[in-house]
Amino acid sequence: MTQSLHLSLGQHARQGMKPQMQDFHGALLPEGGQLALKGAVVALADGISTSPHARTAAEMAVGALVTDYYDTPESWTVQTAAGRVIAATNRWLYGQSRAVAPGDPDRGFVCTLSAMVLKGCEAHLFHIGDSRIARLAGDSLEPLTENHVSGGLLSRAMGISAELRINHRRIPLQAGDVFLLTTDGVHAHVTGRDLRAALERTADLDAVAEHLVGLALQRGSRDNLTAQVLRVDALPDPGTAALGDEAAVLPVPPLPKPGQEIDGFRVLRPLHHSARSHVFLAEAPDGSKVALKIPASEIVEDPEARRRFLLEDWVARRIDSPHVLRAAPLPGPRSALYGVTEFVEGVTLRQWMTDHPKPSLDEARGIVTQVADGLRALHRREMIHQDIRPENILIDASGTVRIIDFGSVAVAGVEEATPGLMGALPGTYQYTAPEYLSGDVVSWRSDMFALAVIAYEMLTGLLPYGTQVARVASRRDQMRLVYRSACDEKSAVPLWMDEALARALHPDPLRRPDALSEFLASLRRPSPGWQAAHRRPLAARNPLRFWQGVSAILAALCLILAAQLGG
């Protein structure tokens, strides 16, 4: 069994000298897979003292983050997931503020927020306002956040505006780290020496938090007081923070023969095999046909390969799109390491391209559009396929296109928990975006590049850069790539579509379209920019009118010249 993140937390809050409690705090320290893939959340908020809605605002800010964060996709990064929850909560608070006190934020749903999400070997800090997160360093408290205060007033807070600037910071964790989250009623009156002394007296972190609150009161605090003391007891083993236990524990089953069963799936016949896996047609307990995938024996002793195999099934179970191969339901817990998906009768796009060497523009556009729809489903979950090529696209008898094979998928949230799981360079050089080879930033635009290569190949039978991409080793090499136009006497590709392909295939990712939808639109009709740059002259659009105009001008010039000569 691998080591997981282990945390200890103590909390205490007191109304103090104020007539009502306007602070709120909360935390959730999950276990198992949820801890590995989402992490632990610790947060506190301080409502502004001038508002009768301060407590509600603080409670909403903390409560929404602690609960709604865990409802976001596991594939999202912490910054995306927590950032969207905080932004949505802020919009709700701002809406309430406008309803009860339009133009007067001092009486609105306004509060501070300071939160930590601890995932893997990192902590993510989210901060708005003048609450504080600090780390104990010797006998000192190292502030990890800055106060958003100007002229004694909050310059940034939840509920003041529909748009919110969130301070986000990532810091590495070490076993033994101690963090202190406080509202201003506490941190203005206690020191690192106070925290260190309290920790030396007791191992009870709740008692430590209570002691700090009591000290602040004794030293004259007249505000509400909240303190959270968080200690990192152990860090997860490197590279095993997510998907590690199941991949390590489950045995690789022996290759089954027709008629044999694995967890209720009855094997019918082999479908395909490769160096990584063997795929069988099987019958599920409900009678439906499924594809049963078993890892090859070569990966049995490779922990990373086992985790990546399991990640394929993990990805399939988190995408809901008619253009992405779906995972099939499991009748119960797995007894062995395998994956199971829907069975689709069809051909790969590679075979389809062989059978249709000269597709119409509409046929090519239809396939590209469906692949793009599947990619968008992945990208919305912060996943990059990384191996889009004709062999990994399936077309069934009805013409529905599906993306298959998730062995190279990069999942931002999993990579965050398990650095290095993404492994070696994915994909096939002919379809690999040059940034993978040059070390440039990889993003969803890398998938768009591969899709554009496929579109180009369907329409021309060629590759836009030939074998040039395989020789890229630096940014300089990347920018030297020379695009080969798709327009020639053998293709029916119009100039405006060639420009659309060239843009999606630009060596610089930032010069490619800003969205897949923009790329698709540019394949259907000339872009406004292209039309402006290639507006046909009158002589080409209406030769008769052009020459009539020229003749009229020449006649007028002749009359003027004759008049001058006659005079």
Regions found by a protein language model. Give the residues of each.
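Conserved short submotifs of the Hanks-type protein kinase catalytic core
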Residues: R334-T348, W352
